[in-house]
Amino acid sequence: MYNWKYQFNQKDLKKAQDLTLVNVERKDDTITADIKDSEFKIEVQIKYNSPYYILCNCNQKGSCHHEAAFWYYVEEHPELFKTPQKDIDEDYYYNELYRITDSGKGQDYQYHEILDFDRMAGSLSRFIAEDIENLLNDGGYKLACELLCRVSDLLSDEYAVDSDMWYDVAEAFCQCAYPLTESIHIDDDLAGKLDGKISDVTQYGV
């Protein structure tokens, strides 16, 4: 599970353990909750069935102990983000990405092993927006991370960044990948790997 505690200082983590969340309600991609015996409320935006953005009405700058209390609640109630188990055809996704990569093997590849990013860009954008999004909706979080890491390798190629279509694909990649680095459904090692791949892409100015 995502190591959320690094966001908080030890004082706030300790204070959070004395708090109780009540009236916890999930509706679509939003969770609301009250802090018992107080006027403070929590609102949580969800992305890929995982907490993504947390807002507290205490107006403290940075992360507060009320938000930490929510994370403790998540640890105690994993059913809040339980993902239905669906059969996922991993070969389909790997084969589709291979097909897209293969489509970039033009004349330059034959002689210099340089992929033509322009020939792949449209298909890569669709792969991220449709295939990987569908995969995430089906609970294939780890596979999605591995696929995004491979997409980042294509984006980080020194010849790819010269393409006029590079920015649009890179932006789609980042919008999909960023939330996964803080997902409760993947471990720290995989999140760290994906975060490094994001850095490889964003160094070019996304």
Where are these regions (language model features)?
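Long, low-complexity, compositionally biased intrinsically disordered regions
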Residues: M1-V206
